[in-house]
Swiss-Prot record:
Its EC number is 4.1.1.23. Keywords: Decarboxylase, Lyase, Pyrimidine biosynthesis. The gene is URA4. GO terms for molecular function: orotidine-5'-phosphate decarboxylase activity. It comes from the Eukaryota. It comes from Maudiozyma exigua (Yeast). This is Orotidine 5'-phosphate decarboxylase. The keyword DNA-binding does not apply.
Amino acid sequence: MAFATYEERASVHASPVASKLLRIMASKKTNLCASLDVRTTAELLSLVDQVGPYICLLKTHVDILDDFSMEGTVKPLKELAAKYNFLIFEDRKFADIGNTVKLQYSSGVYKIVQWADITNAHGVTGSGIVKGLKEAAQENSDEPRGLLMLAELSSKGSLAHGEYTTGTVEIAKTDKQFVFGFIAQRGMGGRDEGFDWLIMTPGVGLDDKGDALGQQYRTVDDVVSTGSDIIIVGRGLFGKGRDPTAESRRYRDAGWDAYLKRCNAASN
């Protein structure tokens, strides 16, 4: 059973956040994560209202927002997440020592741990980063929180490959309940050791091949067939001249079709 269904995985997953996310994916029939990098709260909330019915996960970079506030941004964002049944992933990419990331996660302007179901981290500083972030989650949130490790990136010339990727996977193994997956371009293994990593893949496009700043796009079928569970799509949903509702529906359908193909191939 190389590729179990989302429902099967949800029922036995070690991570409460992963189980919740997998259940949402199964019930909404979507493996689409919308990445909405805009500069105002009004733009963000408007886009979320359009794509919300079609996504399982919203990926944010709140430090891009010129007008971020807990009351004006986070509160309505959480309300939309409840309305449309999706989780929130703040793409913070923590990359410091344990004590520092603990404070970055819990404190400051953004207080990420209070509202983001999921965040992520680089493995460059070692396993202390996982410990620091988990402590912040335990001390500052009554809701379950989960961490993704950045194993691979979609940008041209990325150094996240080879020994770095292998080392990052080893760091992820230090906490099975808190670390539940990776940002990666393919499956990261681990099933023979009892790990069920969720793989989220950026750089997915149905139309575009790349941009002038080094982004490289792969097709939905390609990333799902090689082990990705969630496709992360940004400008493909709301870029110039695009209808966010229509595009999110199109990517949702493409992602779900690719998932069904993977399940069928595994059962044959």
